[in-house]
Regions:
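Non-catalytic C-terminal accessory modules of carbohydrate-active enzymes
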Residues: 1-130
Length: 131
């Protein structure tokens, strides 16, 4: 979706019978949704942590708490000092796949129990040895 929305014809151009300029939340909610999608995504049991954040955020640190996923899942995660940590809790048992920065981890969530994890994000550059 592109976020375009026509609600009322306050300029009286014939687009709608409603000629008032109503207050709408689409623009505000669109930006909040985009930010959440940068931090956390979930579809069909596959969780993606920080899938679209800028490199600068990874270096400075970023976090979110208690974002809802599908099937009663609640997730919190943070990046601090090059370490990603996360906590996931579910209202019902389910298998999940957690993807972050090219690595995939799988786990079984029990109802009411917390699944936690950590991942070192520091990358090393390997160079050919000069002879």
């Amino acid at each position: 979706p592109n976020g375009f929305h026509l609600n009322g014809d306050f300029q009286r151009k014939g687009y709608s019978e409603f000629t008032y300029r109503p207050f709408t939340l689409e623009g505000n909610m669109f930006s909040a949704d985009a930010l959440q999608e940068m931090l956390f995504q979930m579809k069909n049991g596959k969780i993606r942590l920080f899938p679209a954040i800028p490199e600068e955020w990874k270096e400075k640190g970023v976090s979110f708490q208690n974002l809802r996923g599908e099937n009663g899942l609640m997730c919190s995660a943070k990046i601090e000092d090059g370490i990603l940590t996360w906590k996931i809790q579910s209202e019902k048992p389910q298998k999940v796949s957690i993807e972050a920065f090219g690595k995939v981890m799988e786990g079984l969530l029990e109802a009411g129990k917390m699944l936690t994890g950590s991942q070192n994000m520091i990358k090393y550059r390997i160079c050919k040895r000069k002879e």
